[in-house]
Amino acid sequence: MSEALTELASYLGEARGNLIAASQMKYGELTLTTTGENLIALLTFLRDDAKCGFVNLIDICGVDWPQRELRFDVVYHLLSPKQNVRIRVKVATDEDTPVPSACAVHPGADWFERETWDMYGVLFTGHPDLRRILTDYGFEGHPLRKDFPTTGFVEVRYDDAAKRVVYEPVELKQEFRNFDFMSPWEGTDYVLPGDEKAKQ
């Protein structure tokens, strides 16, 4: 499998090296890094080229790296049934720079891009219907960003007296506590009772 991917990586470097910023083989998987300007051309080539045949877009997901200037990676997972291999294509972007929509190349990208926008706030230009898909219409923020609070901003519940769903500010019943426990995999620096001989 990795032999076929190594051959594919060298072929892509020769055929469309101008569209690929970086190519990495890690853990038997091939990841191509490109720019937003070259994304659609690369996805189209990967789909249409006879030696590639990546006709299935399996998923699009986001990764948040808050310490980076281009904090988001948009990752496209592709499958070639003809070659029986999978690859990833990555594009880095920030909060304000949109990524071109892949809906024209892979119509199945529609809901994947909506999910990536909903969870991370990554914008896609040319998307036919970019709106929330997993969170509520009035939801504020993007919950998979690393800077999103784990408690959220509002609590949603059904009010039986009002016979409707109500939104209320989050009210924590206790103060925030930090549970900094020792990892069971690291062991102890002290001798546990009854274990005196084990440390000798």
From Swiss-Prot:
Keyword ATP-binding (UniProt): no
Catalytic activity: a quinone + NADH + 5 H(+)(in) = a quinol + NAD(+) + 4 H(+)(out)
Gene Ontology molecular function, alphabetical: NADH dehydrogenase (ubiquinone) activity; NADH:ubiquinone reductase (non-electrogenic) activity; quinone binding
Membrane topology classification: Peripheral membrane protein
UniProt xrefs under SUPFAM superfamilies: Nqo5-like (SSF143243)
PROSITE patterns, per database record: COMPLEX1_30K (PS00542)
EC number in record: 7.1.1.-
Keyword annotations of the record: Cell inner membrane, Cell membrane, Membrane, NAD, Quinone, Translocase, Transport, Ubiquinone
Any one GO cellular component localisation term in the record: plasma membrane
Job description of the protein: NDH-1 shuttles electrons from NADH, via FMN and iron-sulfur (Fe-S) centers, to quinones in the respiratory chain. The immediate electron acceptor for the enzyme in this species is believed to be ubiquinone. Couples the redox reaction to proton translocation (for every two electrons transferred, four hydrogen ions are translocated across the cytoplasmic membrane), and thus conserves the redox energy in a proton gradient.
Quaternary structure and partners: NDH-1 is composed of 14 different subunits. Subunits NuoB, C, D, E, F, and G constitute the peripheral sector of the complex.
Family per similarity comment: Belongs to the complex I 30 kDa subunit family.
Protein name in the entry: NADH-quinone oxidoreductase subunit C
Originating species: Rhizobium leguminosarum bv. trifolii (strain WSM2304)
Gene that encodes it: nuoC
